[in-house]
Amino acid sequence: MALKTWKPFITVVSLQFGYAGLSIIAKFALNQGMSPHVLASYRHIVATIFIAPFAYFLDRKIRPKMTLSIFFKILLLGLLEPTIDQNLYYTGMKYTSATFTAAMTNVLPAFAFIMAWIFRLEKVNVKKIHSQAKILGTIVTVGGAMLMTVVKGPLIPLPWANPHDIHQDSSNTGVKQDLTKGASLIAIGCICWAGFINLQAITLKSYPVELSLTAYICFLGSIESTIVALFIERGNPSAWAIHLDSKLLAAVYGGVICSGIGYYVQGVIMKTRGPVFVTAFNPLSMVIVAILGSIILAEVMFLGRILGAIVIVLGLYSVLWGKSKDEPSSSFSDMDKELPLSTPQIVLPSKANAKMDTNDASVVISRPNTNESV
């Protein structure tokens, strides 16, 4: 029971380590001149190749019928995160740093909460103190993001970082750092990411097969992001060149870990914990990226950005505190979802159903679960 309780926490923490690793690898690849649009395209081509065989063989007996409504939802999912968010995210990272990008993505839980509230995936009662904490925390989180962008402050000396490398990224890529532009792109990307997470939760209610949904998202996302990359990089075929270097590593790592496994795992967790829980551990990624970025990429830290990141984390955990007060009700809901599975097991041994074959029994058992998920 203890392991079952902690499994979602361990899983999302592991995801944050995966995301942190990609931030460092992707920034290194971008510093080497890789196009952010080509990276988004290659990432989801790799993800499709990786996840599709698992989805085909493991879901072929349980995959629901594809409807036009579900297809359009998946088409939108492929547009929101693999295409729009990834293009904006990597472009914003090119204008800033890996640490700044990781810190800015802490606004994601706030945006996810607002959208979950709008789509009634999150319980909010403005008269209750825990709901007020969610709303206040969201406002504080956005304020912290603005503080990071506007206030720079003095340089924080780190023994392993070289302050003379502050403009290193700009000289390597030919792109001058622009915090305002970079922060704006990342923030818009986070809005799309939050929309993706909430829409994924909605889609799973009518198409409750996480592997197949992930495969479809990656496949359609790879097509859409490739179209965008071909348009932006037209007349520049060298942008698509890739060798055994950091560019290939970024595409493979991002495709397998962050898209293939990441989309699937967050889909499994949000079916019981909700979309806000999935995004709640982003500050851990920020801490990991800040440490690794200063060591590997020689990134420097400024007081204003650290203060802004602290404000973001305080706001985030105000949201999480309010979210924690909803856990008893969601746990009760989870128990209700498990009840139909036990009911057929009591009915099946009765005389009326003694002659029922195993195929019919499986139908009786699975049907309540499907209805419940819908």
Curated annotation (Swiss-Prot):
GO cellular component: plasma membrane
Family statement drawn from the similarity comment of this UniProt entry: Belongs to the drug/metabolite transporter (DMT) superfamily. Plant drug/metabolite exporter (P-DME) (TC 2.A.7.4) family.
GO BP of this protein: L-glutamate import across plasma membrane; seed development
UniProtKB keywords: Membrane, Repeat, Transmembrane, Transmembrane helix
Single annotated GO MF: L-glutamine transmembrane transporter activity
Record has Membrane as a keyword: yes
Protein name, UniProt field: WAT1-related protein At2g39510
Chief location: membrane
